């Protein structure tokens, strides 16, 4: 055996501990099991997938485009649809939407068709969720979107729709706990160049009252419910994908001039001034506010007429309830007087029959619809005041020569 052969095993034996040294250094650099568990626990707490309260809404740009298009195509009828997304630590991520069928009923047929349309919407939503799951798309309903015109949007159909979405999520096992969100898009402001998108959620007191199903006077007093605290507004932010941002940048940036070895002169720039791909909008300087004011005033008057009719119905039911209660109280007082007279004579008292079987005492009328109509009147009046104030400012500016 040569000397080189005898030296090779020794050098190999000396070089063998190197991997062990590298592994030891890697173990020393790696965190311990306790530290890793603490890091995992902190990460889970930071990314809580199910929170108690929705604090903000993050809306995808494509979903917003679908909402705006549906509301514009359905006008003058109101458009509604379902929101799909996920709750991430109190922030509701809305990634997709789909429209709900519009029954197209008139105001006179609203009471007769309300229950059937609600069932149809629930069945349609269930079928859409099932089909979306079949194609591995987002299929987690988290709320509704509603299109409105001139600010009035709160009605019983919206409340029933939120309750139906909440029941659907709870049935599927997601445990929403009444966290349905309502996205409202005002088409009137969008037509003027100001896209208005607001998000609301039901207040806890209204959720408790809705679970009990009682909205009479005493229930509203106990839960401290008015039209102003039925919904709680939450902030909305818009999120665009990188491709959408690139597309918007391409259509809003003026096209670059062609290659030229000669620098453009001042006369060329004056003859062909650079212009943006999107023309500037001067909608805010338009003085033709008469159609908008007329529409706002007409909408406010219509809602006031509906509220007057609803108040008349509630008043009639309240008077009928008072008459039946007065008859029942008179019957009980007469029976008690007769029994007192019989006891004074030493006779056995007569049994008192149930007044609910003798008299048709109706239930106390619900004041939910009247409260919602008050909210619509408030929204329409605010919108009318804003439009009138804008018109006064523009007319004053035109009078002084500023415009």
Swiss-Prot record:
PROSITE patterns per UniProt: MPN
Domain MPN span(s) in chain numbering: 57-206
Span list, region Disordered: 99-122
Domain of life: Eukaryota
Cellular localization per UniProt: Cytoplasm
GO term, biological process aspect, one: translational initiation
Gene3D superfamilies: Cytidine Deaminase, domain 2
Keywords: Cytoplasm, Initiation factor, Protein biosynthesis
Gene Ontology, cellular component aspect: eukaryotic 43S preinitiation complex; eukaryotic 48S preinitiation complex; eukaryotic translation initiation factor 3 complex
Self-association state and partner proteins as the record states: Component of the eukaryotic translation initiation factor 3 (eIF-3) complex.
Family: Belongs to the eIF-3 subunit H family.
Function: Component of the eukaryotic translation initiation factor 3 (eIF-3) complex, which is involved in protein synthesis of a specialized repertoire of mRNAs and, together with other initiation factors, stimulates binding of mRNA and methionyl-tRNAi to the 40S ribosome. The eIF-3 complex specifically targets and initiates translation of a subset of mRNAs involved in cell proliferation.
Protein known as: Eukaryotic translation initiation factor 3 subunit H
Organism: Mycosarcoma maydis
Lineage: Eukaryota, Fungi, Dikarya, Basidiomycota, Ustilaginomycotina
């Amino acid at each position: 055996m040569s000397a080189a052969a005898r030296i090779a095993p020794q050098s190999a034996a000396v070089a063998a501990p190197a991997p062990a040294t590298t592994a030891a250094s890697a173990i020393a650099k790696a965190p311990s099991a306790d530290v890793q568990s603490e890091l995992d626990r902190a990460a889970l707490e930071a990314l809580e997938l199910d929170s108690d309260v929705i604090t903000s809404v993050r809306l995808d740009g494509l979903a917003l485009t679908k909402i705006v298009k549906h509301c514009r195509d359905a006008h003058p009828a109101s458009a509604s649809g379902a929101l799909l997304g996920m709750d991430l630590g109190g922030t509701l991520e809305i990634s997709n939407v789909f429209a709900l069928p519009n029954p197209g009923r008139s105001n006179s047929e609203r009471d007769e068709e309300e229950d059937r349309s609600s069932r149809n919407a629930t069945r349609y939503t269930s079928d859409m969720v099932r089909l979306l799951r079949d194609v591995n798309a987002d299929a987690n309903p988290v709320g509704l979107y509603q299109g409105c015109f001139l600010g009035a949007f709160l009605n019983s159909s919206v409340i029933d729709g939120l309750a139906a979405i909440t029941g659907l999520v709870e049935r599927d096992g997601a445990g929403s706990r009444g966290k349905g969100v309502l996205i409202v898009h005002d088409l009137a402001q969008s037509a003027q160049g100001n896209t208005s998108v607001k998000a609301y959620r039901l207040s806890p007191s209204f959720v408790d009252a809705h679970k009990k199903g009682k909205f009479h006077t005493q229930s509203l007093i106990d839960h401290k419910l008015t039209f102003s605290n039925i919904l709680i507004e939450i902030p909305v932010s818009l999120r665009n994908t990188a491709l959408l941002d690139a597309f918007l940048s391409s259509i809003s940036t003026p096209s670059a001039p062609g290659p030229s070895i000669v620098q453009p002169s001042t006369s060329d720039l004056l003859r062909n001034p650079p212009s943006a791909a999107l023309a500037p909008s001067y909608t805010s300087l338009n003085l033709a506010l008469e159609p908008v004011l007329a529409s706002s005033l007409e909408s406010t008057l219509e809602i006031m007429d509906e509220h007057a009719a609803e108040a008349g119905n509630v008043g009639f039911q309240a008077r009928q309830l008072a008459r039946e209660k007065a008859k029942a109280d008179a019957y009980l007082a007469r029976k008690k007087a007769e029994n007192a007279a019989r006891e004074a004579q030493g006779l056995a008292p007569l049994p008192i029959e149930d007044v609910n079987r003798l008299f048709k005492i109706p239930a106390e009328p619900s004041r939910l619809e009247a409260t919602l109509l008050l909210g619509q009147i408030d929204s329409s009046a605010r919108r009318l005041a804003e439009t009138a104030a804008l018109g006064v400012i523009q007319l004053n500016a035109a009078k002084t020569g500023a415009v």
